Design a protein with these regions (language model features):
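Conserved PLP-binding active-site segment in aminotransferase class I/II-type PLP enzymes
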Residues: 1-83, 87, 163, 424-425, ...
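Generic structural signal for small/hydrophobic residues in well-ordered secondary structure
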Residues: 26-27, 55, 84, 100, ...
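Intrinsically disordered, low-complexity Ser/Thr- and acidic-rich flexible linkers and loops
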Residues: 62-71, 165-182, 198-212, 349-350
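PLP-dependent aminotransferase-like
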Residues: 90-198
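Conserved PLP cofactor-binding pocket of PLP-dependent enzymes
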Residues: 190, 258-268, 310-319, 358-427, ...
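Active-site region of PLP-dependent enzymes
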Residues: 190-201, 205-212, 217-337
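Short amphipathic alpha-helices in soluble, non-transmembrane regions
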Residues: 250, 351-366, 444-448
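Conserved PLP-binding active-site segment of the aspartate aminotransferase-like
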Residues: 326-349, 370-394, 425-439
Length: 458
């Protein structure tokens, strides 16, 4: 078979490749004001505060519908997605003696934020969406469970309706036994704009049954604005909640640790000490650029979803199986990454790994930015060396803390999550750039054809 030419493709950074005159003007607007800091300066507080409001309105909007005037959501902008996770967990009261349930296919920050808050991560196996399996949650819950953290990985949504139904059932039982309810923190760093079907609320329904944006289901959610994300300010993060008191804590802890309870607080950072602040404030430069990017988001998602659908359809025609959608009648994935299961091949694990690496190498020759998921660096629990080795944050915490002695029951080596482990050695994925032309999509399809016929079928 003749080798197709290597395609010339746009960069895979979904939001950043759309930077243009509007983002430049937004940044210059802040510089002309000489007010890059949110809370004081000659003309401060104009960008990040507005971005928070607009972000909440977007999240509250049904897909394809206008943004409502009142979102019913509280939003705090921070300087990174990792910082958003750390602040949110701190605000939820996570610390020594607590467990946080999290899936094994995520980004290292999901684990790091738990460990840095001195709690113990507890891994939950995945279903065919490669996200948290609702049916696997109950067996991992203990009296120490404080938070459950689903991660819509690479823009592919989990079965959030089933997860929230399970959490409400567990919480009803806990309350009957005098135990505090478990909170749900959605780590939506890679999934801004995705949506899922179900009923939000971890204790009682917080909205009607239906299709909701991810981030609207749990007690809190975080998002990232890093360069690989659907919109980007270079770095940045968002924390969202419906709970006014939780928002008060988030606002305090993302800053200097003081809540702004008075109409005119004594200091710019607040007047009521709640804890130790993280200093995770978003700059006005980030906020200004992010506001422009948010207005572009629907178009970015539409492009990725269109390309992703073409690639998935072709993968099916080749006899391979795309990653399962949580809702086949109303897919809510962002389209950022196209993952597919290789057809039956080697029976032994070594053979599966050799084949997966060969397929990824062949796809890489066409600059498709592929990953054999088993090798997907620190997106996979057993590739996170500090986790497997239980490296401490400082002075032995959290592993040597007497209140965390129960961690000895948990291993993070490969084998802890059998369903996910098997999926990772049989799946390969490619990036879906957000500015592909029809001809570039055709070039990628030709490359998939070639690799299938010369490597996968061999």
């Amino acid at each position: 078979m003749k080798t197709p030419p290597k395609p010339a493709l746009p960069h895979e950074f979904p939001g950043a490749v759309w930077y243009g005159d509007e983002e430049i003007e937004a940044a210059q607007r802040v510089l002309r004001r000489q007010s890059p800091f949110r809370y004081y300066g000659p003309e401060c507080g104009l960008e990040v505060a507005r971005f928070e409001t607009e972000f909440g309105r977007f999240l509250a909007s049904p897909p394809g519908m206008p943004w409502p005037d009142d979102s019913g959501l509280y939003v705090t902008a921070v300087n990174s997605g990792s910082g958003a996770l750390e602040v949110a967990l701190d605000a939820l009261g996570v610390g020594c003696g607590d467990e946080v349930l999290v899936q094994g296919f995520m980004w290292i920050s999901s684990i790091a934020a738990i460990v840095r808050n001195r709690a113990i991560p507890v891994l939950v196996d995945s279903d065919d969406t490669l996200n948290m399996d609702a049916k696997a949650i109950r067996a991992r819950v203990t009296a120490r469970t404080k938070v459950i953290m689903p991660v819509p990985m690479l823009g592919g949504v989990a079965r959030m309706g089933a997860i929230m139904t399970e959490v409400r059932s567990i919480n009803a039982e806990r309350l009957s036994r005098g135990l505090p309810p478990i909170k749900v923190l959605e780590d939506c760093a890679q999934a801004l704009g995705a949506h899922a079907r179900g009923v939000p609320g971890s204790l009682a329904p917080a909205a009607d049954e239906g299709v909701h944006r991810v981030g609207a289901f749990g007690d809190a959610a975080i998002f990232s604005l890093q360069i690989n994300k659907n919109i980007s300010a270079g770095e940045g993060g968002m924390i969202v909640t419906r709970d006014a008191e939780l928002h008060r804590r988030i606002e305090a802890l993302h800053n200097a640790g003081y809540a702004k309870d008075a109409d005119a607080p004594r200091n710019w950072y607040g007047d009521a000490p709640l804890g130790w602040g993280h200093g995770r404030r978003m700059s006005e430069l980030q906020g200004a650029v992010a506001r422009v990017q948010l207005r572009r988001l629907d178009g970015i998602l539409a492009n990725m979803r269109h390309s992703h659908e073409r690639f998935e359809d072709h993968v099916r025609r080749l006899g391979m199986t795309p990653r399962q959608h949580a809702d086949t009648t109303h897919p809510g994935d962002t389209g950022y990454y196209c993952i597919f299961q290789l057809p039956p091949g080697p029976k032994d694990e070594k053979g599966k790994i050799i084949r997966g690496r060969a397929v990824a190498a062949a796809l890489n020759a066409f600059a498709l930015h592929p990953w054999f998921l088993h090798d997907f660096e620190v997106h996979v629990y057993y590739n996170i060396e500090p986790l497997v080795a239980k490296l401490p944050v400082g002075n032995g915490c959290p592993w040597r803390c007497p209140r965390n002695a129960f961690h000895s029951a948990y291993s993070y080596a490969r084998g802890a999550l059998p369903k996910l482990d098997e999926a990772l050695v049989t799946h390969v994925g490619i990036n879906v750039p957000s500015r592909l032309t029809r001809e570039q999509e055709d070039d990628i399809i030709s490359a998939l054809d070639y690799v299938f016929k010369t490597v996968i079928q061999e």
